[in-house]
Curated annotation (Swiss-Prot):
Interacts with CALM, EP300, HDAC3, KPNB1, ZNF208 isoform KRAB-O, PARP1, SLC9A3R2 and WT1. The interaction with EP300 modulates its DNA-binding activity. The interaction with KPNB1 is sensitive to dissociation by Ran in the GTP-bound form. Interaction with PARP1 impaired its DNA-binding activity. This is Sex-determining region Y protein. The keyword Nucleotide-binding does not apply. It holds the Pfam family HMG_box. Residues 1-57 bind DNA. Belongs to the SRY family. The lineage of its organism: Eukaryota, Metazoa, Chordata, Craniata, Vertebrata. The gene is SRY. It comes from the Eukaryota. The keyword Lipid metabolism does not apply. It comes from Apodemus agrarius. Its main location: nucleus. PANTHER family: SEX-DETERMINING REGION Y PROTEIN, SOX TRANSCRIPTION FACTOR. InterPro entries: HMG_box_dom, HMG_box_dom_sf, SRY-related_HMG-box_TF-like. Gene3D superfamilies: High mobility group box domain. GO terms for biological process: cell differentiation; sex differentiation.
Length: 57
């Protein structure tokens, strides 16, 4: 099952790739990691909840 970061990064990866078409996948992954770490617990909460929901399916 996907964890909270994976749930969040699915949509974010797409946006980041569209905004930076020449950026390589490894750099996109690094940027996603930095951005995830900068989110507050409140901003992350919906993604933890969705990951938990997916886990129970």
């Amino acid at each position: 099952p996907m964890n909270a970061f994976m749930v969040w990064s699915c949509g974010e990866r797409r946006k980041l790739a569209q905004q930076n078409p020449s950026m390589q996948n490894t750099e996109i992954s690094k940027q996603l990691g930095y951005r995830w770490k900068s989110l507050t617990e409140a901003e992350k909460r919906p993604f933890f909840q969705e990951a938990q929901r997916l886990k129970t399916l």
